Design a protein with these regions (language model features):
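Non-catalytic, solvent-exposed segments at the cell envelope interface
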Residues: 2-384
Length: 384
């Protein structure tokens, strides 16, 4: 599958200069393309990497922040990641976002967004693939709860289960993971002194008035309200995603400036919002060898078809669509072609024509007569 211009985005403009027509998304159903998570990770990598590498007096603070976000899991790496980093080979990172919402969760529960990021310094390209949160999967190690949603993997077994599930689902190695608590975005913006934004449209929301094209300095609260409005946007949820991306890009632009790198409040706030198995030395390597990969960014998503199974909505991706995504990621990783993964233990139940709700039952039934139990909301297991 080729990623021509309509299927990817390249971010080369300043965030406060983005035009609305440049960010009109392609049609798709219930699929969120949130590139914001990479930018938060990029801030961390650059802030901690440069902060410790260039300015010795801030080394201890940077190291402390990096150590506080370091949360290795039990996954056995499919590849020698130290060797890959040393030689500057392409690597993959599973990016997950937890939205605390009004429940006060912190790195708990299901993931609001999951993306696979590939950094290829040789091609100077970063590839981002969004995965539907409601994608029909069998959670690795919890297959007895099939049918399951992809965003349940983290709730069942933390980052380890999420990584294993994505690896199995797409047949693509995941080298690292990063989990971001989006509930702390307001504090991050305040820590860098606010961000400058040119609103993409005029609207009033939560007591704030936004004027299209008028450069506005926003604190964390105002920026969040600018991001959250959806009903007044003619693009609906896509418009909200565009505004979220705009704010995060502005935060990234501000975060990598020297004043932010020397700001202990910024580093401390950042360290509270992310968990990753990237060590401090890994981050320094990324900063030194992989920043060039951000020169061009390509993004796409796994397309599914919405189906009701056991009274729950799922995004069921065809095997063809899954294979296209597997091909994109493996090519970006300089890996040979391989068949995409199976949804359930080698049984191909991925075609939209093969899964349907029973109508009179709480169970899910396939065209072959196999029946699975009703979708169950997983209980968080308390693991990163």
């Amino acid at each position: 599958m080729s990623l021509h211009r309509s299927q990817h985005e390249e971010f080369e403009n300043r965030p406060d200069e983005l035009e609305r027509e440049e960010m009109i998304p392609r049609p798709r159903r219930k699929s969120r393309k949130k590139t914001i998570f990479f930018w938060i990770l990029l801030i961390l990598v650059i802030a901690l990497g440069i902060g410790g590498h260039v300015l010795h007096e801030h080394y201890l603070n940077a190291r402390k922040a990096a150590d506080s976000v370091y949360a290795p899991n039990s996954v056995k790496k499919q590849r020698d990641v130290d060797r890959l980093l040393k030689k500057g080979k392409p690597i993959s990172i599973l990016l997950m976002g937890t939205d605390t919402g009004a429940l006060g969760r912190s790195f708990k529960g299901r993931t609001d967004t999951m993306m696979v990021c590939v950094l290829n310094p040789k091609d100077k390209t970063m590839t981002l693939v969004s995965l539907p949160r409601d994608a029909l999967v069998a959670i690795n190690g919890y297959e007895q709860y099939y049918p399951s949603k992809l965003n349940s993997a983290y709730a069942y077994g933390g980052s380890a289960t999420a990584v294993k599930t994505v690896q199995k689902y797409l047949n693509v190695p995941i080298d690292f993971y990063a989990t971001i608590n989006m509930g702390g975005l307001e504090g991050l913006i305040n820590a860098v002194g606010g961000v400058d934004i040119k609103p993409l449209l005029s609207f009033s929301f939560a007591g704030y008035n936004f004027v299209k094209g008028k450069k506005t300095h926003m604190d964390g609260t105002e920026a969040l309200q600018y991001c959250r409005m959806r009903d007044q946007d003619p693009l609906g949820d896509y418009g909200r995603q565009n505004r979220q991306r705009q704010v995060i890009m502005a935060l990234a632009f501000k975060g990598v400036q020297l004043t932010s790198l020397l700001n202990d409040d910024f580093l401390n706030s950042l360290s509270k919002q992310l968990r990753t198995d990237l060590s401090f030395n890994n981050m320094v390597s990324l900063n030194m060898k992989y920043r060039v990969a951000t020169h061009h960014m390509k993004s796409t998503h796994l397309q599914g078809t919405t189906q009701v199974i056991g009274e729950a909505d799922f995004e069921v991706a065809s095997r063809k669509n899954k294979q296209e995504i597997t091909d994109v990621l493996r090519k970006a990783l300089d890996l040979p072609h391989a068949e995409t993964g199976d949804t359930l233990k080698g049984t191909d139940l991925e075609s939209p024509n093969q899964l349907e709700g029973t109508g009179n039952s709480n169970d899910a039934t396939t065209s072959t007569g196999q029946t699975y139990q009703t979708y169950q909301t997983p209980q968080y297991q308390g693991q990163y």
